[in-house]
Amino acid sequence: IFARTLDVFTANMSESIEKTIDISRILKSKMGAKAKFVPSFLVSWLKKTVHEDEVNRFLWESRHLQGTEWLTECVKYLKMNIQLEGVENLPDKNDGKLYTFVSNHPLGGQDGVALGSIIGTHYDGKFRYLVNDLLLNLPGLKPVSIGINKTGRQSRDFPRMVEAGFQSDNHMLMFPAGLNSRKQPDGSIRDLPWKKTFIS
């Protein structure tokens, strides 16, 4: 009985510490050999800042969900209270057309998750984000994302990747500022200048 209990405890412990988001691994994948020069205190700070343990716990508990269902679960987990106005202005999902939804980015992850949940629910999951490729580390988000590497060689492929997204049978959701809004010298919080694309 003791051995069986120990086996179950060990299995549960292994499950509980399984990491989907591993800051050290992500740094190494993005920086290669240079990652070893990042001070350990900075790595620890990054882990605390992104709430690595809490995020991994949520990802583990929601691992059976993807796309719109996962985004809606994120809304619940973050205890967001969303009040919708103007839903009647969203185009009919059965009109046979594809739409591009362009938004400012005041909060970053929170508004991205909320909009994805709303658009995904309205259009039966048929949408795609254009996102920073780091977000592809989130398994539930990956199926509805087109990852853009903003710093590496892939950034030159941005037009091609955007074109591929727009040629699909999905609606598109994008944040042209590329980053969440920033506090301005006058105290207001506004988007950075939107990056030029053929729709912004």
Question: Across the structure, where does each feature detected by a protein language model lie?
Answer:
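Membrane-anchoring hydrophobic helices of lipid-metabolizing enzymes
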Residues: F9-Y99, Q110-A114, D124, K142
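Soluble catalytic domains of membrane acyltransferases
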Residues: N81-S200
